Amino acid sequence: MVVLGSTGSIGVNTLEIARRYDIEIEGLVAGNNYEVLNAQIKEFKPKYVVVKDLKTAEKIDFPNVKYGEEAVLDMIEKSKSDLIVNALVGDAGLRPTLKAQECGKKIALANKESLVNAGKFIDTSKITPIDSEHFGLWYLLIEKCRVKSEKCNVKKLYITASGGALRDWSLEDIKKATLKDVLKHPNWSMGVKITIDSATMVNKLFELLEAKWLFDTDKIDAFIETKSIIHALVEWQDGSTTAHISKTDMKLPIAFAVLDEVNDEILSPVNLLEVGGLEFRKIEVEKYPVWEIKDLLLIKPDLGVVVNTANEFAIEKFLEERISFIDISGIILKAVQKFENVNINGIDDVFEIKNEVRKWCESNFV
Protein backbone atom coordinates (compact mmCIF):
# COMPACT_ATOMS: atom_id res chain seq x y z
CA MET A 1 0.00 0.00 0.00
CA VAL A 2 0.86 3.69 -0.21
CA VAL A 3 0.67 5.79 2.98
CA LEU A 4 0.03 9.52 2.66
CA GLY A 5 0.83 11.32 5.90
CA SER A 6 3.11 8.58 7.21
CA THR A 7 4.70 10.58 10.05
CA GLY A 8 1.45 11.72 11.68
CA SER A 9 -0.42 9.75 14.36
CA ILE A 10 -2.62 7.89 11.84
CA GLY A 11 0.34 7.18 9.57
CA VAL A 12 2.50 5.85 12.40
CA ASN A 13 -0.33 3.56 13.57
CA THR A 14 -0.93 2.42 9.98
CA LEU A 15 2.70 1.40 9.67
CA GLU A 16 2.42 -0.44 12.97
CA ILE A 17 -0.36 -2.55 11.42
CA ALA A 18 1.77 -2.98 8.28
CA ARG A 19 4.67 -4.18 10.45
CA ARG A 20 2.47 -6.65 12.32
CA TYR A 21 0.96 -8.15 9.17
CA ASP A 22 4.02 -7.84 6.92
CA ILE A 23 2.32 -5.53 4.41
CA GLU A 24 4.59 -4.10 1.72
CA ILE A 25 4.83 -0.30 1.69
CA GLU A 26 5.23 0.97 -1.88
CA GLY A 27 5.20 4.68 -1.13
CA LEU A 28 5.47 7.14 1.76
CA VAL A 29 4.33 10.77 1.76
CA ALA A 30 5.13 13.12 4.65
CA GLY A 31 5.33 16.80 5.53
CA ASN A 32 8.53 18.01 7.17
CA ASN A 33 9.16 15.50 9.97
CA TYR A 34 12.29 14.19 8.27
CA GLU A 35 13.68 12.28 11.27
CA VAL A 36 10.62 10.02 11.60
CA LEU A 37 10.39 9.64 7.81
CA ASN A 38 14.05 8.61 7.50
CA ALA A 39 13.48 5.90 10.12
CA GLN A 40 10.40 4.70 8.20
CA ILE A 41 12.33 4.62 4.92
CA LYS A 42 15.08 2.55 6.53
CA GLU A 43 12.59 0.01 7.90
CA PHE A 44 9.99 -0.28 5.12
CA LYS A 45 12.19 0.39 2.05
CA PRO A 46 9.52 2.07 -0.12
CA LYS A 47 9.85 2.53 -3.88
CA TYR A 48 8.57 6.12 -3.74
CA VAL A 49 9.02 8.93 -1.20
CA VAL A 50 7.44 12.38 -1.45
CA VAL A 51 7.73 15.27 1.01
CA LYS A 52 6.21 18.72 1.32
CA ASP A 53 9.03 20.92 0.01
CA LEU A 54 12.60 21.09 -1.29
CA LYS A 55 14.00 22.12 2.10
CA THR A 56 12.71 18.87 3.65
CA ALA A 57 13.67 16.80 0.59
CA GLU A 58 17.32 17.76 1.10
CA LYS A 59 17.24 16.07 4.54
CA ILE A 60 15.77 12.76 3.36
CA ASP A 61 17.94 9.63 3.08
CA PHE A 62 16.42 8.43 -0.21
CA PRO A 63 18.04 8.57 -3.66
CA ASN A 64 15.05 9.81 -5.65
CA VAL A 65 12.92 11.76 -3.18
CA LYS A 66 10.30 14.06 -4.74
CA TYR A 67 8.44 17.00 -3.26
CA GLY A 68 5.19 18.91 -3.75
CA GLU A 69 1.56 18.07 -4.53
CA GLU A 70 2.15 17.15 -8.18
CA ALA A 71 4.72 14.58 -7.10
CA VAL A 72 2.15 13.02 -4.75
CA LEU A 73 -0.42 12.78 -7.56
CA ASP A 74 2.18 11.35 -9.94
CA MET A 75 3.18 8.71 -7.38
CA ILE A 76 -0.45 7.64 -6.90
CA GLU A 77 -0.81 7.24 -10.66
CA LYS A 78 2.43 5.25 -11.02
CA SER A 79 1.88 3.03 -7.98
CA LYS A 80 0.85 -0.59 -8.40
CA SER A 81 -0.75 -0.76 -4.95
CA ASP A 82 -4.51 -1.27 -4.83
CA LEU A 83 -4.79 0.65 -1.55
CA ILE A 84 -4.02 4.29 -0.79
CA VAL A 85 -4.11 5.33 2.88
CA ASN A 86 -4.85 9.07 2.93
CA ALA A 87 -3.92 10.45 6.34
CA LEU A 88 -2.87 13.89 5.11
CA VAL A 89 -4.03 16.85 7.20
CA GLY A 90 -6.47 19.42 5.85
CA ASP A 91 -6.93 20.45 2.23
CA ALA A 92 -3.69 18.74 1.21
CA GLY A 93 -5.68 15.49 1.15
CA LEU A 94 -8.35 16.46 -1.38
CA ARG A 95 -6.54 16.16 -4.72
CA PRO A 96 -4.84 12.87 -3.71
CA THR A 97 -8.26 11.39 -2.88
CA LEU A 98 -9.62 12.48 -6.27
CA LYS A 99 -6.53 11.13 -8.05
CA ALA A 100 -6.76 7.79 -6.23
CA GLN A 101 -10.42 7.54 -7.24
CA GLU A 102 -9.56 8.41 -10.84
CA CYS A 103 -6.97 5.60 -10.83
CA GLY A 104 -9.48 3.08 -9.47
CA LYS A 105 -7.71 2.63 -6.14
CA LYS A 106 -9.31 1.65 -2.87
CA ILE A 107 -8.97 4.46 -0.35
CA ALA A 108 -8.56 4.13 3.41
CA LEU A 109 -9.56 7.67 4.28
CA ALA A 110 -8.54 9.56 7.40
CA ASN A 111 -8.58 12.94 5.63
CA LYS A 112 -11.95 14.42 6.60
CA GLU A 113 -11.62 17.40 4.30
CA SER A 114 -11.91 15.23 1.17
CA LEU A 115 -15.55 14.41 1.90
CA VAL A 116 -16.32 17.76 3.54
CA ASN A 117 -15.15 19.67 0.46
CA ALA A 118 -16.13 17.32 -2.33
CA GLY A 119 -18.30 14.50 -0.99
CA LYS A 120 -20.77 14.73 -3.86
CA PHE A 121 -17.97 13.95 -6.36
CA ILE A 122 -16.45 11.01 -4.50
CA ASP A 123 -17.51 7.38 -4.96
CA THR A 124 -17.82 6.33 -1.33
CA SER A 125 -18.21 2.65 -2.29
CA LYS A 126 -14.40 2.62 -2.76
CA ILE A 127 -13.73 4.29 0.59
CA THR A 128 -13.21 2.81 4.04
CA PRO A 129 -13.13 5.49 6.73
CA ILE A 130 -10.26 5.54 9.22
CA ASP A 131 -12.22 7.25 11.94
CA SER A 132 -13.47 5.77 15.19
CA GLU A 133 -17.01 7.15 14.75
CA HIS A 134 -17.61 6.15 11.14
CA PHE A 135 -15.88 2.84 11.67
CA GLY A 136 -18.25 2.28 14.60
CA LEU A 137 -21.29 3.04 12.43
CA TRP A 138 -20.00 0.78 9.68
CA TYR A 139 -19.39 -2.01 12.19
CA LEU A 140 -22.96 -1.72 13.51
CA LEU A 141 -24.58 -1.48 10.08
CA ILE A 142 -22.56 -3.78 7.84
CA GLU A 143 -24.24 -7.09 8.63
CA LYS A 144 -27.80 -5.88 8.80
CA CYS A 145 -27.89 -3.13 6.23
CA ARG A 146 -25.03 -3.60 3.81
CA VAL A 147 -24.01 -0.10 4.97
CA LYS A 148 -26.78 1.85 3.20
CA SER A 149 -29.03 2.73 6.13
CA GLU A 150 -32.01 3.66 3.95
CA LYS A 151 -32.34 0.00 2.98
CA CYS A 152 -33.04 -1.31 6.46
CA ASN A 153 -34.93 -0.31 9.57
CA VAL A 154 -32.58 2.38 10.86
CA LYS A 155 -34.30 5.29 12.55
CA LYS A 156 -31.24 7.42 13.31
CA LEU A 157 -27.44 7.29 13.48
CA TYR A 158 -25.45 8.89 16.29
CA ILE A 159 -21.77 9.65 16.70
CA THR A 160 -20.19 10.80 19.93
CA ALA A 161 -17.92 13.71 20.79
CA SER A 162 -15.45 14.05 23.64
CA GLY A 163 -16.25 17.74 24.05
CA GLY A 164 -12.61 18.70 23.57
CA ALA A 165 -10.10 20.22 25.94
CA LEU A 166 -12.41 22.99 27.19
CA ARG A 167 -15.43 20.77 27.78
CA ASP A 168 -15.60 21.47 31.52
CA TRP A 169 -14.63 25.14 31.34
CA SER A 170 -17.03 28.01 32.03
CA LEU A 171 -18.01 30.30 29.16
CA GLU A 172 -16.01 33.12 30.75
CA ASP A 173 -12.87 31.00 31.01
CA ILE A 174 -13.25 29.76 27.41
CA LYS A 175 -12.96 33.36 26.22
CA LYS A 176 -9.46 33.46 27.75
CA ALA A 177 -8.29 30.03 26.54
CA THR A 178 -4.77 29.84 25.09
CA LEU A 179 -3.39 27.47 22.46
CA LYS A 180 -1.73 25.45 25.23
CA ASP A 181 -5.11 25.04 26.95
CA VAL A 182 -6.88 23.97 23.76
CA LEU A 183 -4.29 21.28 22.97
CA LYS A 184 -4.84 19.41 26.26
CA HIS A 185 -7.33 16.86 24.91
CA PRO A 186 -8.98 14.80 27.69
CA ASN A 187 -9.13 11.43 25.90
CA TRP A 188 -7.19 11.26 22.62
CA SER A 189 -3.64 11.97 21.51
CA MET A 190 -3.99 13.69 18.12
CA GLY A 191 -2.45 16.28 15.83
CA VAL A 192 -2.70 20.03 16.46
CA LYS A 193 -5.43 20.85 13.93
CA ILE A 194 -7.81 18.04 14.85
CA THR A 195 -7.35 18.80 18.57
CA ILE A 196 -8.39 22.41 17.95
CA ASP A 197 -11.28 21.20 15.78
CA SER A 198 -12.36 18.96 18.66
CA ALA A 199 -12.44 21.92 21.04
CA THR A 200 -14.55 24.06 18.67
CA MET A 201 -16.75 21.07 17.66
CA VAL A 202 -15.89 21.71 13.99
CA ASN A 203 -14.51 18.17 13.93
CA LYS A 204 -17.96 16.79 14.76
CA LEU A 205 -19.62 18.99 12.13
CA PHE A 206 -17.24 17.49 9.59
CA GLU A 207 -17.98 13.97 10.81
CA LEU A 208 -21.73 14.49 10.43
CA LEU A 209 -21.16 15.60 6.86
CA GLU A 210 -18.86 12.64 6.24
CA ALA A 211 -21.55 10.31 7.60
CA LYS A 212 -24.09 11.84 5.23
CA TRP A 213 -21.94 10.89 2.25
CA LEU A 214 -20.68 7.55 3.57
CA PHE A 215 -24.05 6.20 4.73
CA ASP A 216 -26.37 8.11 2.41
CA THR A 217 -28.55 9.59 5.14
CA ASP A 218 -29.45 12.89 6.81
CA LYS A 219 -30.70 11.07 9.91
CA ILE A 220 -27.51 11.66 11.84
CA ASP A 221 -26.74 13.53 15.06
CA ALA A 222 -24.11 13.74 17.79
CA PHE A 223 -23.77 14.16 21.54
CA ILE A 224 -20.96 14.21 24.09
CA GLU A 225 -19.85 10.98 25.79
CA THR A 226 -17.17 12.11 28.20
CA LYS A 227 -15.01 8.96 28.30
CA SER A 228 -14.87 8.34 24.53
CA ILE A 229 -15.44 4.61 24.74
CA ILE A 230 -18.79 4.66 22.90
CA HIS A 231 -17.98 5.88 19.40
CA ALA A 232 -21.24 5.37 17.53
CA LEU A 233 -24.83 4.23 18.04
CA VAL A 234 -27.64 3.08 15.78
CA GLU A 235 -31.24 3.70 16.81
CA TRP A 236 -33.54 1.17 15.12
CA GLN A 237 -37.19 1.47 14.17
CA ASP A 238 -38.13 -1.30 16.63
CA GLY A 239 -37.03 0.86 19.57
CA SER A 240 -33.68 -0.78 20.25
CA THR A 241 -30.31 0.98 20.14
CA THR A 242 -26.94 -0.66 19.51
CA ALA A 243 -23.59 0.90 20.39
CA HIS A 244 -19.99 0.38 19.31
CA ILE A 245 -17.58 0.34 22.25
CA SER A 246 -13.79 0.22 22.02
CA LYS A 247 -10.70 1.83 23.49
CA THR A 248 -9.44 5.20 22.24
CA ASP A 249 -6.95 3.74 19.79
CA MET A 250 -7.03 4.20 16.01
CA LYS A 251 -5.37 0.86 15.27
CA LEU A 252 -8.75 -0.89 15.18
CA PRO A 253 -10.33 1.20 12.38
CA ILE A 254 -6.97 1.22 10.59
CA ALA A 255 -6.74 -2.58 10.70
CA PHE A 256 -10.21 -2.98 9.18
CA ALA A 257 -9.40 -0.38 6.53
CA VAL A 258 -6.14 -1.96 5.34
CA LEU A 259 -6.86 -5.68 5.86
CA ASP A 260 -9.56 -7.60 4.02
CA GLU A 261 -10.44 -9.51 7.16
CA VAL A 262 -9.58 -9.09 10.85
CA ASN A 263 -9.69 -12.14 13.12
CA ASP A 264 -6.95 -11.24 15.59
CA GLU A 265 -7.25 -9.13 18.71
CA ILE A 266 -6.15 -5.65 17.64
CA LEU A 267 -7.04 -4.02 20.96
CA SER A 268 -7.85 -5.48 24.34
CA PRO A 269 -11.58 -5.11 25.12
CA VAL A 270 -12.93 -2.30 27.26
CA ASN A 271 -13.41 -3.44 30.86
CA LEU A 272 -16.82 -1.95 31.59
CA LEU A 273 -16.53 -2.65 35.31
CA GLU A 274 -13.42 -0.49 35.45
CA VAL A 275 -15.13 2.23 33.41
CA GLY A 276 -17.91 2.55 35.96
CA GLY A 277 -20.47 5.18 35.04
CA LEU A 278 -20.93 6.86 31.67
CA GLU A 279 -21.98 10.46 31.16
CA PHE A 280 -23.82 11.83 28.14
CA ARG A 281 -24.26 15.53 27.43
CA LYS A 282 -26.03 17.62 24.85
CA ILE A 283 -23.76 19.68 22.59
CA GLU A 284 -24.68 23.20 23.71
CA VAL A 285 -24.58 26.03 21.16
CA GLU A 286 -23.54 28.46 23.92
CA LYS A 287 -20.30 26.53 24.46
CA TYR A 288 -19.86 25.35 20.86
CA PRO A 289 -21.24 28.16 18.64
CA VAL A 290 -20.58 26.35 15.34
CA TRP A 291 -23.17 23.73 16.35
CA GLU A 292 -25.75 26.34 15.35
CA ILE A 293 -25.18 25.43 11.67
CA LYS A 294 -25.35 21.63 12.10
CA ASP A 295 -28.76 21.17 10.45
CA LEU A 296 -28.05 23.74 7.75
CA LEU A 297 -24.85 21.91 6.80
CA LEU A 298 -26.69 18.61 6.35
CA ILE A 299 -29.39 20.30 4.25
CA LYS A 300 -26.86 22.29 2.20
CA PRO A 301 -23.68 20.17 2.14
CA ASP A 302 -22.07 22.51 -0.42
CA LEU A 303 -21.42 24.75 2.59
CA GLY A 304 -18.83 22.22 3.73
CA VAL A 305 -16.17 23.89 1.58
CA VAL A 306 -17.03 27.27 3.12
CA VAL A 307 -16.81 25.96 6.69
CA ASN A 308 -13.58 24.12 5.98
CA THR A 309 -11.85 27.05 4.28
CA ALA A 310 -12.88 29.55 6.96
CA ASN A 311 -11.81 27.09 9.66
CA GLU A 312 -8.37 26.54 8.16
CA PHE A 313 -7.87 30.30 7.88
CA ALA A 314 -9.01 30.86 11.48
CA ILE A 315 -6.79 28.10 12.87
CA GLU A 316 -3.76 29.58 11.09
CA LYS A 317 -4.45 32.93 12.76
CA PHE A 318 -5.05 31.27 16.16
CA LEU A 319 -1.73 29.43 15.89
CA GLU A 320 -0.10 32.77 15.09
CA GLU A 321 -1.81 34.17 18.23
CA ARG A 322 -3.51 36.86 16.14
CA ILE A 323 -7.05 35.87 17.16
CA SER A 324 -8.62 34.30 20.26
CA PHE A 325 -10.00 30.78 20.49
CA ILE A 326 -13.64 31.95 20.34
CA ASP A 327 -12.85 33.99 17.22
CA ILE A 328 -12.43 30.73 15.29
CA SER A 329 -16.15 29.96 15.59
CA GLY A 330 -17.07 33.57 14.88
CA ILE A 331 -15.14 33.63 11.60
CA ILE A 332 -16.73 30.35 10.48
CA LEU A 333 -20.28 31.54 11.22
CA LYS A 334 -19.73 34.86 9.44
CA ALA A 335 -18.33 33.05 6.40
CA VAL A 336 -21.37 30.76 6.27
CA GLN A 337 -23.65 33.79 6.49
CA LYS A 338 -21.76 35.47 3.64
CA PHE A 339 -21.66 32.41 1.35
CA GLU A 340 -24.91 30.70 2.40
CA ASN A 341 -26.19 30.46 -1.19
CA VAL A 342 -23.07 28.79 -2.55
CA ASN A 343 -23.74 26.21 -5.27
CA ILE A 344 -21.18 23.63 -6.37
CA ASN A 345 -21.78 21.95 -9.73
CA GLY A 346 -18.34 20.55 -10.49
CA ILE A 347 -15.01 19.83 -8.84
CA ASP A 348 -13.52 23.05 -10.28
CA ASP A 349 -16.17 24.98 -8.34
CA VAL A 350 -14.76 23.58 -5.10
CA PHE A 351 -11.36 25.16 -5.71
CA GLU A 352 -12.84 28.43 -7.00
CA ILE A 353 -15.05 28.80 -3.92
CA LYS A 354 -12.14 27.93 -1.63
CA ASN A 355 -10.14 30.77 -3.17
CA GLU A 356 -13.07 33.17 -2.89
CA VAL A 357 -13.73 32.32 0.77
CA ARG A 358 -10.03 32.55 1.60
CA LYS A 359 -9.72 36.00 0.01
CA TRP A 360 -12.84 37.19 1.84
CA CYS A 361 -11.47 35.96 5.18
CA GLU A 362 -8.11 37.63 4.59
CA SER A 363 -9.73 40.97 3.75
CA ASN A 364 -12.22 40.92 6.64
CA PHE A 365 -10.32 39.44 9.59
CA VAL A 366 -7.00 40.28 11.29
Swiss-Prot record:
It catalyses: 2-C-methyl-D-erythritol 4-phosphate + NADP(+) = 1-deoxy-D-xylulose 5-phosphate + NADPH + H(+). It is an enzyme of class 1 (oxidoreductase). GO terms for biological process: isopentenyl diphosphate biosynthetic process, methylerythritol 4-phosphate pathway involved in terpenoid biosynthetic process. Pathway: Isoprenoid biosynthesis; isopentenyl diphosphate biosynthesis via DXP pathway; isopentenyl diphosphate from 1-deoxy-D-xylulose 5-phosphate: step 1/6. GO terms for molecular function: 1-deoxy-D-xylulose-5-phosphate reductoisomerase activity; manganese ion binding; NADPH binding. Catalyzes the NADPH-dependent rearrangement and reduction of 1-deoxy-D-xylulose-5-phosphate (DXP) to 2-C-methyl-D-erythritol 4-phosphate (MEP). Belongs to the DXR family. It holds the Pfam family DXP_reductoisom. It comes from the Bacteria. PANTHER family: 1-DEOXY-D-XYLULOSE 5-PHOSPHATE REDUCTOISOMERASE (PTHR30525), 1-DEOXY-D-XYLULOSE 5-PHOSPHATE REDUCTOISOMERASE, CHLOROPLASTIC (PTHR30525:SF0). Mn(2+) binds at D131, E133, E207. InterPro entries: DXP_reductoisomerase (IPR003821), DXP_reductoisomerase_C (IPR013644), DXP_reductoisomerase_N (IPR013512), DXPR_C (IPR026877), DXPR_C_sf (IPR036169), NAD(P)-bd_dom_sf (IPR036291). HAMAP family: DXP_reductoisom. Its EC number is 1.1.1.267. NADPH binds at T7, G8, S9, I10, G31, N33, N111, E113, G191. 1-deoxy-D-xylulose 5-phosphate binds at K112, S132, E133, S162, H185, S198, N203, K204, E207. Its cofactor is Mg(2+); Mn(2+). It comes from Nautilia profundicola (strain ATCC BAA-1463 / DSM 18972 / AmH). NCBIfam families: Dxr. The lineage of its organism: Bacteria, Pseudomonadati, Campylobacterota, Epsilonproteobacteria, Nautiliales. This is 1-deoxy-D-xylulose 5-phosphate reductoisomerase. Keywords: Isoprene biosynthesis, Manganese, Metal-binding, NADP, Oxidoreductase.
